[in-house]
């Protein structure tokens, strides 16, 4: 990122912090409402290398919340749209895209080129089995000295209160239905710890389905998934720079 574009970052994180961001590699898996907005914020935050993983194309139902979704991008691969957006924001950012669906079986192979070089991984995956598989892989690689910091987004559907979002270990979560299922599956798969962003808000009740008995999809507010993505990006950036906000609002260097 050129110095003019980075001047507000330098004022907050200092030259050392901005250099750490420019040298960092962050992998974002899932470019939906959370992941696409997280990737955009990471690009604006000066991350030097982004790896973007998703297999979907932009659909009309994405427009209310996803950074990749415009009437002009309908039908296009989300990875392609996100890559163009990142390059337009920060031409100096190196972008790798992986147009693939993540499974328990292909996850090690897809991540293999980046293992040992990842400063952070953002899990914005929709499916629980893949989320836990990623957490288990991070744990197993960590035992070999090749692990990576991982933060996982929990459910933002049918929720309206971003002030109730919290970072916690999965074992300390409550209220969120996805977290309940994740805790159970983590125990089953031997995942001991997983940092997550979750909401303490009780989800709104779903609107009843039609006469055919089909359940309506989870509702999503235009602001909730993007705020979650922005919060995760902020969390990652603060961890990479070693700077956090003090109670008085002054930036403080974290102890390592």
Predicted segments, located by residue:
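Short amphipathic alpha-helix with an adjacent loop that forms part of the alpha/beta core around
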Residues: 106-116
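Glycine-rich phosphate-binding loop and adjoining beta1-alpha1-beta2 segment
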Residues: 47-90
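Hydrophobic/small residue at the entry helix of a nucleotide-binding pocket
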Residues: 34
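Conserved SAM/SAH-binding loop
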Residues: 98-107
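Glycine-rich phosphate/adenylate-binding loop
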Residues: 114-119, 127-136, 140, 147-150, ...
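N-terminal charged helix/coil linker that caps or initiates catalytic domains
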Residues: 1-26, 60
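Conserved N-terminal Rossmann-fold NAD(P)-binding element of oxidoreductases
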Residues: 28-30, 53
């Amino acid at each position: 990122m050129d110095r003019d574009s980075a001047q507000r970052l330098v004022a907050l994180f200092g030259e050392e912090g901005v250099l750490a961001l420019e040298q960092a590699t962050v992998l974002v898996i899932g470019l939906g409402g959370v992941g696409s907005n997280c990737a955009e914020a990471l690009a604006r935050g000066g991350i030097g290398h982004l790896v973007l993983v998703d297999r979907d194309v932009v659909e009309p139902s994405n427009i209310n919340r996803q950074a990749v979704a415009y009437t002009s991008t309908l039908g296009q691969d989300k990875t392609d749209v996100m890559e163009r957006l990142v390059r337009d924001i920060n031409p100096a950012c190196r972008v790798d895209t992986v147009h693939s669906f993540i499974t328990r079986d292909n996850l090690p192979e897809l991540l293999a080129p980046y293992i040992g070089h990842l400063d952070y991984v953002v899990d914005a995956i929709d499916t629980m089995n893949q989320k836990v598989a990623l957490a288990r892989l991070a744990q197993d690689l960590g035992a070999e000295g090749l692990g990576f910091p991982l933060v996982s987004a929990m459910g933002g559907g049918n929720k309206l209160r971003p002030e109730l979002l919290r970072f916690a270990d999965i074992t300390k979560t409550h209220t969120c239905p996805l977290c309940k299922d994740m805790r159970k599956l983590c125990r089953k798969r031997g995942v001991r710890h997983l940092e997550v962003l979750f909401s303490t808000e009780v989800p709104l009740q779903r609107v009843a389905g039609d006469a055919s008995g089909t359940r309506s999809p989870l509702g999503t507010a235009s602001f909730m998934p993007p705020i979650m993505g922005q919060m995760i990006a902020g969390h990652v950036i603060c961890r990479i720079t070693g700077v956090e906000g003090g109670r008085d609002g002054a930036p403080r260097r974290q102890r390592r």
